[in-house]
Amino acid sequence: MTDSDPDADPPLELESRRTIYQHVRDNPGSHFRALLADLEYAQGTLQYHLRQLEAQGSLERSDDGKYTRYYPAEEFDAVDQAVMNALRREYARRIVAHLAVEGALSTADLSDRLGRSPSTVSWHLSKLEDADLVTKERQGRSVDYELRDPERVQYLYTIHRRTFTDRVVDRLFDLWDSY
């Protein structure tokens, strides 16, 4: 270890960092409050170790507009992080699931399926569009939305399914798997 701080700890030498890193690997896209609740570290301790893991290149962070989410470095590219960020939000996850299973749908169709107002669905769709996860195409007087890469969404959902807690979405993806 030449040219480095002799007091610096290697990235995963400390048990607490290994624990945090492993938890993020097992639950990619976890946000700070979820990590705080799951790992039961003091807030300052967790912040410190997350910063150290980022600085050492073990973790990356992604901002989804509401939360800062953490990912193992080099395991998720920016598109995968955007997909996982969406899958971590309940209504975005449900919208993505319907689009994955049913293909292109309008705001009204999604509103009916989700039991939410069209304005709420539209807001979530605009966030998905900003993240470049959906495309929209005008169909007469309505606009249909479609996943940009449904196979990638299905793959990421399938791999990380156990980290999501939404039985409705599980049933929709099970339906898709049955085709």
What are these regions (language model features)?
Residues 10-11, 24-28, 85-86, 99-102:
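Short helix-capping/hinge SLiMs at alpha-helix to coil transitions
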Residues 40-52, 115-130:
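Short amphipathic alpha-helical interaction segments
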Residues 1-18, 66-93:
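Short alpha-helical segments that sit at the start of domains
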Residues 78-119, 152-179:
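Amphipathic alpha-helical dimerization/coiled-coil segments
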Residues 1-13, 19-22, 41, 52, ...:
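Long, low-complexity, charge-rich intrinsically disordered regions
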Residues 20, 31-75:
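Acidic (E/D-rich), amphipathic helical modules within compact regulatory domains
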Residues 28-39, 104-114:
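Short acidic, hydrophobic short linear motifs in intrinsically disordered regions
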